[in-house]
Each structure stands twice: as structure tokens, then as C-alpha cells.
């Protein structure tokens, strides 16, 4: 599977609106997990995959989710890989945000004990 550009689907770990959608999608998924599990393994896998399809529809919109998942079979590993890709994107965005603010602080924060590399104040 090709790497997914989650930014194209509105994933922005620095946006409150994104986190509102993400938290709502997770909450909805948690409610679905309370449902009784099917008896057959094949049906459990289908439910697992369908739960993720609904999660992505809640997160990125139904049309985007259909586009993203149209060729994905009901295979647990495939959906695990897609979710791992989403989490990697969020992690990378948060790490970049932390690097950016650290760089800003290093460059512009007044020199204080423990921050000798900061720019001098005027």
C-alpha cells in the first residue's frame, strides 16, 4: 500500500478542530466496541474492518474515507497498517511542532540559566 498523505485529508495535529473530530471518532469507535462480537472469526474481522471504515468516515468525511479505503479488502492487517500510518503522521506533526517551538525559544527567548544559547535581549 502506498504511503497516505494524511494532510490531504485534513489531519493536522496542531488544530483544535482536528482533535475535536479525532476525539469524536474515537468515542464513537469505543461505543461500537461494546457491541457483542460475532461468533465466526471471518465475521469478527469484517466487523473490525467496518468499525475502522466508520472511524475514518467520522474523522475525514465519508467521501474521503470511501476514496481512501475503496480498494482495501476486509483484512485486519491492512487496517492496522492504515491506522499505524495515521498515528505516525500525527506523531511526526507533533514532533515537528515541538522542534519548531524549541528553535524559536532557542533563538528568541532571553538568555537565562540553562538557555545560554538564546538570543540576547535588547
In which residue ranges do the predicted regions lie?
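Intrinsic-disorder/low-complexity regions
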Residues: 1-7, 11, 19, 63, ...
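A generic structured-segment signal
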Residues: 35-36, 41-73, 79-85
Amino acid at each position: 500500500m502506498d504511503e497516505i498523505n494524511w494532510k490531504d485529508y485534513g489531519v493536522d495535529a496542531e488544530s483544535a478542530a482536528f482533535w475535536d473530530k479525532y476525539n469524536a471518532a474515537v468515542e464513537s469507535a469505543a461505543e461500537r466496541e461494546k457491541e457483542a462480537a460475532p461468533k465466526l472469526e471471518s465475521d469478527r474481522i469484517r466487523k473490525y474492518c467496518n468499525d475502522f471504515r466508520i472511524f475514518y468516515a467520522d474523522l475525514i468525511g465519508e467521501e474521503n474515507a470511501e476514496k481512501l479505503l475503496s480498494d482495501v479488502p476486509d483484512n485486519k492487517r491492512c487496517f492496522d497498517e492504515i491506522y499505524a500510518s495515521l498515528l505516525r503522521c500525527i506523531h511526526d506533526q507533533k514532533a515537528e511542532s515541538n522542534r519548531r517551538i524549541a528553535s524559536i525559544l532557542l533563538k528568541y527567548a532571553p538568555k537565562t540559566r540553562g538557555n545560554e544559547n538564546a538570543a540576547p535581549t535588547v
